[in-house]
Amino acid sequence: MDSSLVNSGLQARLGIRPHCAGIFIAAWTLLAAGCPAQSAETPFESSLAPKAAGRIDELVFAKLDRLTIQPANLCSDAVFVRRAYLDVIGTVPTGQEASEFILSQNANKRRALIDHLLEREEFADYWAMKWGDLLRVKAEFPINLWPNAAQAYHRWIRDSIRGNKPFDQFARELLTSSGSNFRVPPVNFYRAIQNREPEGIAQTVALTFMGVRAEKWPAEKLTGLAAFFATVGAKSTSEWKEEIIFFDPKKPNARSFTPVFPTGITAKLSVDQDPREVFADWLIDPKNPWFARNIANRVWSWLLERGIIHEPDDIRADNPPSNPELLACLEYELITAKHDLKHLYRLILNSQTYQLACVPRGDKPEAAANFASYPLRRLDAEVLIDALNRLTGTTEKYTSAIPEPYTFIPEEVRAIELPDGSITSSFLEMFGRAARDTGLESERNNRPTAAQALHLLNSSHLQRKLEQSRMVRTLTQSKDISPEVINGFYLTVLSRFPTDQERKIVASQLQGQGYKNREAAVDLTWALLNSAEFLYRH
């Protein structure tokens, strides 16, 4: 079939301006449908086969070998720098950051980059956003924390992450704190639970800290766990929307049920002892079968799309791990590191398993569950709009459905920094931002939709950003479309140097239209921002 007919048909279906079609097709086909070109070495992979660099790799590769699945090659440096920035700090690298990393001759540059990113301020911003989903940090309906409580809660979460607070301490403070929801931020863990009956609290605790959906448990097992939270009291104060969370041993029916740990062992409590503290001590004990397993599995899923137990918040006996030895290894590492989550991040990020290319070496159905290649996944809504704003030099307006004095957000604030799930935008809603109503991982939806594609292809929202773009100004103000200008453009948008073919296409399109033709520059930027390579983690 004549390729010109195929291309013209594609233009018609997508509404692509004809003079931009060559650029768009070149950009789109690089990673279209998650299938990069299968050449010996592409922009997405190196020519190097992986070799086990530690215990994680030994366990993953041994399982793949038993399944006769060949792992992907290692990813290229260009892919790694973009992947690491997105996965660790939820931010795309600048063109200069990408260029310096790619050109560096330091044999340990990947390890050095990981260490650097784990100490960046954006690490706390991004992971506070992720924990905000799980802990339901939301001011308005149906969580109703109220704006100043939501912001205090978010600040405490962010400060805990920034200070690398041990995860067992983080969990214990959430479970045992008492006081004002405005002045003792972790008590908002209880305030953010919709069903504040003991059974409702128990289900949320099990989901958050054990990765278990306790509503599926036998009634007597759930009742035993709920008894630990039967004395959680709440009372209002004279300050509007302030609430005090406290241990209330006189609460009606507080001692009607006997607290029983999920292991089936009955707890021994004194009359004046807060059962929450007894449960928290049991939960974070290194011998506990759920606590370390839950967070180790979640961290793995956050970095590699799926848990070793999948889904990561549905741990149960009939949902076994795909690699039990691997999960046990991560649990052991976390416990011996005294629940230092950065230690866990560092181990996973430095593994060859994490650094595999997104280009699979086969099509066996078991490959994905056993981590034979890096999974393709669309950027989080917040990460995507921040990337668009950064690349175009524009800002975004975020508002709450019920405006309050506390919810004014300056336009320069990035989406990953938003402290409250009630503060949003139509873009964030369209692109699947978590509702923060249940704490389930599935609330966040990164699956692409037709509405999203149409928005990126045809919306005035993106068009306005492109018209104001610094990149467009650079392309139109350059006296000559030199290789350096094209290199800088690709490094800024895709965090890599263009291939020779891409450089020729871009040069011909711009020179063919006149290199000062603003519309051609806008179209070029638009084409790359609509490419799967830009929109997906890879």
Which residue ranges define each predicted feature?
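N-terminal secretory signal peptides that target proteins for export/translocation
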Residues: 1-17
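Bacterial N-terminal signal peptides
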Residues: 20-33
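Boundary at the C-terminal end of the N-terminal hydrophobic targeting segment
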Residues: 34-39
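Short, structured secondary-structure elements
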Residues: 41-265, 277, 290-331, 339-476, ...
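Penicillin-binding protein/beta-lactamase superfamily catalytic region
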Residues: 269
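Conserved micro-motifs of the catalytic ATP-binding
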Residues: 495
